[in-house]
Regions:
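Hydrophobic alpha-helical membrane-insertion signals
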Residues: 1-5
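Surface-exposed beta-strand-to-loop junctions
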Residues: 6-8, 25
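Active-site flanking loop/helix segments enriched in acidic
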Residues: 10-12
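Alpha-helical scaffold segments of alpha-solenoid architecture
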Residues: 211, 217, 222-223, 234
Length: 238
């Protein structure tokens, strides 16, 4: 396959889900895990053909709403950071530099106030991705980037929940996702900075939110179909 002719803006299905999956790049992690298991250099070659094609095609399209969707950009930065972590012992200097270039593009985009989806679940994911990326991107102002991320994370967490534990986006699904985001934020802060983490959420409020979520769960372990909630079971929540 000739990756050099891929049009990363092409959406043959005219479907937002397709283009979202294409640009969040979770499949790159799947390929990385497959490479680590098999040590098949052909798999790694495919990975970097994909990444190089994306970089050459997209680095000058910073205003394209498909490539730089507010949520897809956040998840791509998160996935590239994770890729750097799990593949650090298997990549060349040139491959490392390519990943740094891609991550820098996404980080710079996420830093822009006009791109930041403030006070939304997307904004929190953007901030969490910015925080994670600050441990893998090698630039001089990395501490400034991390501090911006921490400030945004704490602001998003404070805004998202009411005093009674409810979620302001106001559906069972968003409460579930919101509590999941809180736990992920606390976990990622401890993972990278241990007791020095500055990411904060009041424990009493978290307990209230978990209690509210518990009252939402029906006898069949599913959430009521209120608002934009779709049918799903809560599994391994904590």
């Amino acid at each position: 396959m000739n990756f050099n002719i891929i049009d990363w803006t092409y959406n043959p299905y005219d479907h937002t889900g397709y283009i979202f999956i294409l640009h969040k790049m979770e499949y790159v992690l799947d390929l990385a895990y497959f490479f680590i298991k098999t040590r098949d250099e052909g798999i790694k070659e495919i990975i970097f053909d994909i990444l190089n094609s994306w970089y050459l095609s997209c680095n000058d399209k910073l205003d394209n709403p498909w490539i730089f969707h507010d949520h897809a950009t956040a998840l791509r930065a998160f996935n590239i950071s994770k890729f750097l972590n799990i593949m650090k012992n298997y990549i060349s200097e040139d491959q490392f530099l390519l990943l740094q270039k891609i991550l820098a593009i996404d980080v710079n985009k996420l830093l822009m106030d006009e791109f930041y989806s403030k006070n939304t679940n997307h904004g929190l994911d953007q901030s969490l991705s910015l925080y994670k990326a600050s441990f893998f991107l090698e630039v001089d102002n990395i501490l400034d980037i991390r501090n911006v991320a921490i400030e945004r994370i704490n602001s998003e967490l404070k805004f998202a929940f009411c005093d009674d534990g409810g979620h302001k986006e106001n559906s069972p699904a968003y409460l579930y996702y919101g509590v999941s985001q809180v736990l992920r934020a606390l976990d990622i802060g401890y993972k990278y900075e241990k007791e020095n983490t500055k990411i904060y959420f009041p424990l009493d409020l978290l307990k209230k939110s978990c209690l509210v979520l518990g009252y939402f769960v029906q006898f069949n372990e599913k959430m009521p179909l209120i608002g934009d909630t779709v049918e799903f079971k809560i599994n391994n929540f904590l």
